């Protein structure tokens, strides 16, 4: 039997985590032969509720689940971990400006970055789900200087999956036929879902759709606004779909992307595609051996470049507002 992998999940008593933890314990993320130890973090007032979640996990009798720790201390939660899924974040409340949300969450992720730096395994893989995810990931990374920058990522996979579904519906094919979707930039309404390189059963998606008006006024805005539409429909934000995206993101990062396909991940920019260093930016990547690599040499249209730069400018604006929290 393999050595158990230690997985930390923050915001562990919350809605996304409730859809996430049982799937991790069942082997959906790391495989059906990989034991796991869950190290769960939440704020003190949520620990009674979290104890109930742990009771449910116990009652599932998952063969792969070796142990569970619950705590309100980041250092306890992150000690010797291999994977961190930073789900917990302060939600935006009525009347709250985005800069106030950035500040409130920046303080949380600064502390978590410092704790990761001090006690996490040196090979740790960190996925930030809590919004604003890209900038929260950047704050976490900058406060963990002893860890490799490539250890940090933010979640673009929910946007990616949404884009795959919308394209599949448009062309009347199953989602399994869609490959090479990209969502560039920030996980926000400035993101750029790009189907210009996507394929449906090996055929170029843009050629199949053959409708630039739909791409510009249908496809792109639908993906950008989908999260808000979910909130309006169910009264709360995406939870099960976000948890599923987190599972997909980490599974592919650890085990590799399928042959002939790529995925979208928020990662530290390195100058690729004209995006300067200094932000966590959504890129198309392939994963192998636990490492990701940006897909090189894609042709970028003027329309795409304009959208990509707009998302970059938004990220730079976010970074400017929290620069005092960067280590």
Curated annotation (Swiss-Prot):
Pfam families: Ldh_1_C (PF02866), Ldh_1_N (PF00056). CDD domains: MDH_chloroplast-like (cd01338). It catalyses: (S)-malate + NAD(+) = oxaloacetate + NADH + H(+). Substrate binds at residues 92, 98, 131, 162. SUPFAM superfamilies: LDH C-terminal domain-like (SSF56327), NAD(P)-binding Rossmann-fold domains (SSF51735). HAMAP family: Malate_dehydrog_2 (MF_01517). This is Malate dehydrogenase. It comes from Nitrosospira multiformis (strain ATCC 25196 / NCIMB 11849 / C 71). The gene is mdh.
């Amino acid at each position: 039997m393999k050595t158990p992998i230690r997985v930390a999940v923050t915001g562990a008593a919350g809605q996304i985590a409730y859809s996430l933890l049982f799937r991790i314990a069942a082997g959906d993320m790391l495989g059906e032969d990989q034991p796991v130890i869950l190290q769960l973090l939440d704020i003190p007032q949520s620990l009674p509720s979290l104890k109930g979640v742990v009771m449910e996990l116990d009652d599932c009798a998952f063969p792969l689940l070796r142990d569970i720790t619950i705590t309100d201390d980041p250092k306890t939660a992150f000690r010797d971990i291999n994977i961190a899924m930073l789900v917990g974040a302060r939600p935006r409340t009525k009347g709250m400006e985005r800069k106030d949300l950035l500040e409130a969450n920046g303080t949380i992720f600064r502390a978590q970055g410092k704790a990761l730096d001090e006690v996490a395994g040196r090979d740790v893989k960190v996925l930030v789900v809590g919004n604003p995810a890209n900038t929260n990931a950047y704050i976490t990374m900058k406060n963990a200087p002893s860890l490799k920058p490539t250890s940090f990522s933010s979640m673009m996979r929910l946007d990616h999956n949404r884009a795959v579904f919308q394209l599949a519906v448009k062309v009347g094919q199953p989602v399994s036929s869609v490959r090479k979707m990209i969502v560039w930039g920030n996980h926000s309404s400035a993101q750029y879902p790009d189907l210009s390189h996507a394929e449906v059963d090996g055929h170029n998606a843009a050629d199949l759709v053959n409708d630039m008006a739909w791409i510009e006024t249908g496809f792109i805005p639908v993906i950008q606004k989908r999260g808000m539409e979910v909130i309006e429909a169910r009264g709360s934000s995406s939870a099960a779909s976000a948890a599923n995206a987190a599972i997909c993101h980490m599974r592919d990062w650890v085990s590799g992307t399928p042959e002939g396909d790529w995925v979208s991940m928020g990662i530290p920019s390195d100058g690729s595609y004209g995006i300067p260093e200094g932000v966590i930016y959504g890129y198309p990547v392939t994963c192998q051996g636990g490492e990701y690599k940006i897909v090189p040499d894609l042709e970028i249209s003027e329309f795409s470049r304009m959208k990509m730069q707009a998302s970059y400018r938004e990220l730079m604006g976010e970074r400017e507002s929290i620069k005092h929290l960067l280590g």
